[in-house]
């Protein structure tokens, strides 16, 4: 999820994209979903992509109806989002990143202590490094591996 005022996650995703590119993973994509579609028009998103110098060859910015976005975020990804006048942009949202595989499953991974990670904190560079490893691992393994699989 993305709120255009939240640049830390975007900068970390730029780094993630750069690191994953070194492995030449064919089906890797980043999807950023605007949680403020009333303000984040297609033109605003295009300007944001340009101003942040984002490589949009495999990074897509999505928007839609507020109700549908909030339902997808809350029910599909199990992340928080909502309106809050005291939050930047009047919207609160999770800064977490999830991995969704080619079959539509939300994938878990392991942290350095071998604890299961359900989401990755988009504001932490240490989680970006974990994401790179998980994405590389998923690109090299069979769909039926020994990790937890949760249908989104």
Q: What do the PLM-derived regions correspond to, one by one?
A:
Residues 46-94:
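Short, internal strand/loop/helix patches
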Residues 1, 33-38, 54, 65-67, ...:
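Solvent-exposed coil/turn segments that connect beta secondary-structure elements
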Residues 8-12, 70-75, 96-107:
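Conserved long hydrophobic alpha-helices within structured protein cores
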């Amino acid at each position: 999820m993305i709120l255009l005022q939240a640049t830390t996650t975007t900068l970390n995703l730029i780094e993630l994209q750069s690191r994953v590119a070194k492995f030449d993973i064919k089906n890797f994509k980043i999807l950023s979903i605007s949680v403020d579609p009333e303000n984040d028009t297609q033109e605003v998103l295009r300007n944001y992509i340009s101003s942040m110098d984002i490589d949009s060859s495999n990074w897509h910015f999505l928007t839609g109806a507020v109700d549908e976005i909030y339902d997808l975020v809350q029910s599909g990804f199990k992340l928080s989002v909502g309106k809050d006048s005291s939050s930047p942009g009047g919207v609160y949202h999770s800064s977490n990143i999830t991995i969704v595989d080619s079959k539509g499953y939300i994938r878990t991974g392991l942290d350095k202590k071998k604890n299961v990670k359900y989401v990755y904190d988009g504001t932490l560079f240490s989680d970006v490094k974990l994401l790179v490893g998980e994405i590389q691992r998923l690109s090299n393994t069979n769909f039926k591996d020994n990790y937890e699989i949760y249908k989104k």
